[in-house]
Amino acid sequence: MLFRSIRVEGQPLRKVGGKGYLIDTGGSGFELGRDALIMAFRATDGRCEHTALVELIEAQMGVPVDRWMEKIYDPVTGGRPFIASFAHNVFKARAMGDWAAQEIFDRGAHLLGDLTHAAAKWFDGEFSVAMNGGLVINFPEYAEAIRKAAHPRAKMIPSGAPPVYGAAVEALWDIGMEPGPAFREHFLNAYAQMQKNP
């Protein structure tokens, strides 16, 4: 759930957040996974208290900490998706009462909530925000924390569509077209078929 477009009827689209994967990753799976790795490395170096993230990440890595770097930077299997795959450990460790996981969780929810505070200036009253993405779908506690961090006038609603649907809708808006219910139905059916037969 990284903001992309603010749509106010009769006005041009405005952008908040969504500045790309090199700059604007606040609260994303990549950022949570990266921060989990950072805290695990810090703990094993003795730069902070121990965190359960060390054991959880070591179990997922399948190798001891001194071999993590080669997996993270592997040109074939490492990189951003690999790093994002560690995000779920934040939620596991947080459920165990881990201090580092709680900090990562809180910071991510706050960064996503901030987007709604920036968007609020464009609306006179309540405004809807579609919540989407693997983290808010699979971890309802994260969605709830984002809701709490959001602007009081932001109506946070589950999207019910894959994130790519929002990109398609935005593309139509960019060319002055209005996506209606038929577009949504056709898009979601085509997407479902594509998922069955990649």
Predicted regions mapped to residue ranges:
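ATP-binding/phosphotransfer module of carbohydrate and carboxylate kinases, centering on a glycine-rich
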Residues: 38-198
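Short beta-strand-to-turn element immediately C-terminal to the catalytic PLP-Schiff-base lysine
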Residues: 5-9
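Hydrophobic, well-ordered secondary-structure segments
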Residues: 13, 29-37, 50-54
